[in-house]
Amino acid sequence: MKMFITGVFFVLHGLVHLLYFGQSRRLFELRPKMVWPDGAWAFSRLLGNETTRLLASISCVLAAIGFVAGGIGIFARQAWWHPVVVGAAVFSAVVFVLFWNGELQNLRDQGAIAILINIAILVAVLILRWPNVEF
């Protein structure tokens, strides 16, 4: 049962990245007046906001694919879920750090909660060796 819940969690965490995809493509606003990823400290000045939004969109889809694939790996009882989820968590955290606007206001709009979840996933999987299962 814990593997099923863990797999569902990873799939849902991946799907939340698609909300940030929609935000970055301007398909909808997650919150009124939310402009993420415009003003990203690592890309906006260099590439402009339009290209930054495209890069953020692609990155969010890749992170989503990683988490969904990891969840599917758990459901299918495949050992490869572990490196896939670790890679997705690291990639996702790096994405949100790079697309952060550099300000300390509205951190939750900048992906701070996703970063905290990714850190928790990394601690659980790499340090605590959770979930401890044999396939």
Label for each model-derived stretch:
Residues 1-135:
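Membrane-interface extramembranous regions
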